[in-house]
């Protein structure tokens, strides 16, 4: 906001450039994180170790971007004291990069575990179930990032609604996993399936982070904190605005 910046055009331009940079960097980080998750999922389902190994490299970049964006946001807060929309933008970016970093961590965990799996002991039908859950989560992660990029409240609300379905799908997946585990009498095979269940949990958590990003987007656009509000109530309140 230019009222914070004094009277010189030079300072105003510097401020605008700084605000544009943190938003651009956030979208860059989003793209890296989304690619990491897609690679981790493909590596897990298709036993592609090269993709799983690639995720570790991306995780380093994700962490670097998070630190860079965080530092730039704090510099703006310290030197420019932004208000109104700009302040809300910075708050949202700081929240979003935290969720993105955690998505990156979960993707890295999936990749690391998949490298240790013994695929000979895994029923292909189980991998299909896991793939469906993973693809559903991939879709809402993409849509949550897109809702932020487009500042789309409707798209963000759709992400939040869809996350509930993913939670149900995760529970169904876990029941299927447990039904396999109870039939096993080999410790190595049990450990194998426990690793798969950990991957499934990571996928479900990524869906939760996607939901968070969608909630942050609504706060950015509407100034409403909806973290403890139902989608139906949010729609009703927004219709009254």
Predicted regions and their residues:
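Cytosolic, long alpha-helical scaffolding segments
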Residues: 1-241
